[in-house]
Amino acid sequence: MGRLFGTDGVRGVANRELTAELALALGAAAARQLASGSAPGRRVAVIGRDPRASGEMLEAAVIAGLTSQGVDALRVGVLPTPAVAYLTGAYDADFGVMISASHNPMPDNGIKIFGPGGHKLDDGTEDRIEALVGDAGPRPVGAGIGRVIDAEDAADRYLRHLSKASTLRLDGLTVVVDCAHGAASSVAPRAYRAAGARVIAINADPNGLNINDNCGSTHLDSLRAAVVAHRADLGLAHDGDADRCLAVDADGNLVDGDHIMVVLALAMREAGELASDTLVTTVMSNLGLHLAMRSAGITVRTTGVGDRYVVEELRAGDYSLGGEQSGHIVMPALGSTGDGIVTGLRLMTRMAQTGSPLSDLASAMQTLPQVLINVTVADKATAATAPSVQTAVGQAAAELGDTGRILLRPSGTEPMIRVMVEAPEKDIAQRLATRVAEAVSAAR
């Protein structure tokens, strides 16, 4: 059996790989590891979920695991992942648990665990939790068993926190918000309206089965059409758990996480808020971001893929902005993890501050043509290190020289290898990416 924890918690098809039994065992193991050193008194874990149908089953199982170890479960209901992270700190809980598979299809689900203060766990802590899975250990009885408490004020507390993200009123801005029929369906429109924007919410009617179904940050067509139809200033797309945000301008053109980071980095540097004039991003960010930041005199620190690694670098260097091309944007002053709604508020604040349309702000970065091909494989390690694959990568890199780059990356959550190529021309990137992808496919 491989490692349970991937780059973003434990994921799998609900009731197949991610069973109620495993969820119970993970809840109990997390309780033993993360609440064992707590001060005297009741131990508490915050637990939330996105609206997918299997979340109810898994929430019940995790709560059973928590309470079996004497930990009280503070249930916050359907809220975004960053809300659970924030509330873990706000309620002074020992740790937090979010049940979500983010942008994945509805049949999938996942379990993310946050430590004290709402920070994602490091690899070592995850390994220690995993080692305890299946080891029930001592169990309390009687009054020592944990209780379940519903946090009635959770959404309102999170909304008050979100209000800090917008330093200017957004009156006059019209935004279309695609909530992906996910965890943001209630709170995102409320947050944007509270800041003054005129909000048109789409895909905001979750029924447990329609999350991420041709909508949200991975399917932007309906958002583009709605922005143009309503003559909105911009559109914002969240994923199922609202830890990411992508945007489209008034003409429906994509403004991805790289462009958003450039816009926010320039704004924060202008305000004296960009610590050490440094932006943290991952190896997936487009070369155009690096060129734009170099031109502006801003240093770029690069990490592995996954917002947890961005957060680790932000904390290590005491930096103030980081993120991913996929739309996970992290601002430590406003949260311990990526928050799509905070990102949307900050982006609109910059528009209100400058009076500029999003297209003008995003033009500070020119994207190099990029091709990304996902290749399904049986064994990620074997396929990635095969001599034939390494030869194909070397040949492509030699052809590109310093005019582009190639990246071969095993997915942290799915059985696939991602082949990414950037080049001066799209046809060059497509040709080289296809060649390498064919080598990976043949080696799988």
UniProtKB/Swiss-Prot annotation:
Binds 1 Mg(2+) ion per subunit. Gene3D superfamilies: Alpha-D-Glucose-1,6-Bisphosphate, subunit A, domain 3, Alpha-D-phosphohexomutase, C-terminal domain. It catalyses: alpha-D-glucosamine 1-phosphate = D-glucosamine 6-phosphate. The keyword Isomerase applies. One of its GO terms (molecular function) is phosphomannomutase activity. Activated by phosphorylation. GO terms for cellular component: cytosol. The modification Phosphoserine is found at residue 102. Its cofactor is Mg(2+). It is an enzyme of class 5 (isomerase). The active site is at 102 (phosphoserine intermediate). It holds the Pfam family PGM_PMM_III. InterPro entries: A-D-PHexomutase_a/b/a-I, A-D-PHexomutase_a/b/a-I/II/III, A-D-PHexomutase_a/b/a-II, A-D-PHexomutase_a/b/a-III, A-D-PHexomutase_C, A-D-PHexomutase_C_sf, A-D-PHexomutase_CS, Alpha-D-phosphohexomutase_SF. The keyword Phosphoprotein applies. Keywords: Isomerase, Magnesium, Metal-binding, Phosphoprotein. GO terms for biological process: carbohydrate metabolic process; peptidoglycan biosynthetic process; UDP-N-acetylglucosamine biosynthetic process. Mg(2+) binds at residues 102, 239, 241, 243. Its EC number is 5.4.2.10. Catalyzes the conversion of glucosamine-6-phosphate to glucosamine-1-phosphate. Belongs to the phosphohexose mutase family. HAMAP family: GlmM_B. This is Phosphoglucosamine mutase. It comes from Mycobacterium avium (strain 104). The lineage of its organism: Bacteria, Bacillati, Actinomycetota, Actinomycetes, Mycobacteriales.
